[in-house]
Amino acid sequence: SPYLLQHSSNPVWWQEWSAEIIQYAVDGKKPLFVSVGYATCHWCHVMAAEAFSDIDTANFLNSHFICIKVDREQRPDIDQFMMQYLTALSGNGGWPLNVFLTADLRPIYALTYAPVRSSGPQQSFLSIAKKVHEYYEKNADDIEPFITKEVHPPIAGEESLVKNLLSYYDPDYGGFDPGQKFPPHSTLLYLLYFLCVENNPDVQTICRKTLDAMRLGGLNDHLQGGIFRYCVDRQWTIPHFEKMLYDQAMALWCYSLAYKVIGKSEYKKMAESIVRCLDDCFADNGLFISAHDADTEHVEGATYVWSYTELKDFLGPDEFKRFCASYDIDEQGNFEGLIHLIRKNDVSLYDIEDKLLFLRNKRAQPARDNKIICGINALVAIAMIQAGRNLERPELEEKAAQIIRRLIDLFWDGKTLGHSYYNGAKQNKNFLFDAAALLTAISMIYENDASWNTLMTTIAAYVESFRDGEKWVESRAADFQQVFASWFDHPIPSSVSLAEMGRTRVALLTGKETKFKSYRASYQADFFNITVMMNNGLFHVISSKSAVAWSELSPNTLQTRGETQTDCYRGTCRVLKEK
């Protein structure tokens, strides 16, 4: 893991999570200090450079705890357990996620970032660690276990979903958060599919305003394509500069669908710029790496921002005038005296943007997390399939099929599905998210080519192995306790939502009955609610002897092969005339 390697020079004696190291702690009656993060996490870098590089802190941790580093992207089950405890304890979450536990995994205390030195009311990490150890020494036998529960959003009525989303919506700037603005991928997808069923002017406004704010503002990399993780302000001005693969996949799906549903050409342009970013920045031997760091040489955003003088001197007078007419260029800057590029309009400036990108590429670049994650790559395949259909670019669908074949070759052994691949080594832990995302992708490519049927059926059965009665579990890893799968659809679809979509699609495509599902609370379970639409008859299921061109179909459509051409929708099937 690139993340674990980032901490290899710390004086803290970090261990990797394993059954053996947990048993060692049990045998030695020593508590655990578990720190969870990921390779492109800014505050993880800060803590690595501060507290975890401090000799006094390291000596105390090494003497009194077994210290374990966890890459959350490699062990989502451990991350989810620790995060549930942190949020139950404090009401907040985040990374680095630092948890003190007994050797038998009873949590003692949890926190995110803490400085190396105390400052006013903010305690140093070392002082916190000392208090935790003192508490443990006095109360070890009385510390209660933390029992994880299946936390699912409440059932909601169909009529309340859009109404509730309207109440969360920011009418001034778009999006749904009152402060920091995260791209609301699943919410946008739900609303866009809703527009396929009902042309609601308020929903049109929400989608347009949010999609335009995301593509014109600071979330978008206007030179390279692709989007950053989130914006730190309500106005979508300054991003947290990391680029995550999952954001590119979800944004590609959103913008291609928005083009198909709303018809605005700028959404097609945005989708195609994300494809370019994937090819130029994330592609690796037929698959895609996980992320690009927010920092360049320990400075956040250094690769992406410009000085006013730099822009003015590099561009010719006419170019600079044209550039300032389309970009919001202030001599005082908008980010620590420098300029992060934000568009004012959609005037084409390809010549200038390519020139600036050429210069930018000569700078030092952010570190890359070169880990290949099965489920996130499956999300890319899903997005490529949908973009191919929505943009009428069938080569993207073929590219998606190649991604799926590569994932099967790399991760599927005929019985179980591996999780990640890095530097020649494959991690064979099995997670619902990977299986569910892959099943959903296969079910989409099956619509083009029925020869995928056997594999689709096999992976569908594998997904069902993650059921525990009526509940889904994220993993059955032998070195950790069972954790129920997440329902929360941000920033990406949850494991539960992907599993339900995959199994619903397979049922509809193979002529099996589906049971009525209830909608869940909006904003928490928006991707799940797309599956409810599908399950409850709000997606067309077209059956025909030969494939119907996707350009002729509504986006809320599945299609499969049959002897007669039928369209099943809202509980009624009608025979269509053969063309």
Regions found by a protein language model. Give the residues of each.
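Long, polar/charge-rich, low-hydrophobicity segments
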Residues: 280-283, 409-436, 441-571
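Acidic, serine/threonine/proline-rich low-complexity intrinsically disordered regions
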Residues: 264, 386-400, 446-453, 505, ...
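Primarily a tetratricopeptide repeat
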Residues: 205, 209, 269, 273, ...
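Replace the tail clause
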Residues: 1-383, 387-390, 516-579
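Extended, hydrophobic alpha-helical segments in both membrane/secreted and soluble proteins
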Residues: 40, 227, 251, 384, ...
